[in-house]
Curated annotation (Swiss-Prot):
Subunit (UniProt): Interacts with the ligand binding domain of the thyroid receptor (TR) (in vitro). Requires the presence of thyroid hormone for its interaction. Interacts with transcriptional regulator SEHBP. Interacts with nucleosomes.
Native source species: Pongo abelii
Lineage: Eukaryota, Metazoa, Chordata, Craniata, Vertebrata
Protein name per Swiss-Prot or TrEMBL: High mobility group nucleosome-binding domain-containing protein 3
Gene Ontology biological process: chromatin organization
Subcellular location, record wording: Nucleus
Pfam family, one: HMG14_17
Predominant place of localization: nucleus
Amino acid sequence: MPKRKSPENTEDKDGSKVTKQEPTRRSARLSAKPAPPKPEPKPRKTSAKKEPGAKISRGAKGKKEEKQEAGKEGTAPSENGETKAEEAQKTESVDNEGE
């Protein structure tokens, strides 16, 4: 079976080797195209470092919610005894109305 002839191994009748010359120049499109600029990386949010104020505010919010829920029931003690004084006034006014 005859071998395939490649352009590199082609020989004329003379026995001289004919080689295909490849162009050494790059195309104008490729040489004129600049390298694309690298996008600046966006700063990432650090989840490892937490603000100490954030923890305090969350705890305070949770406590406030508990106080509000308990205040709705009417059994929650409030600061400085304000609720106790109001309850006492209510009971006195109810007693006075009955007399």
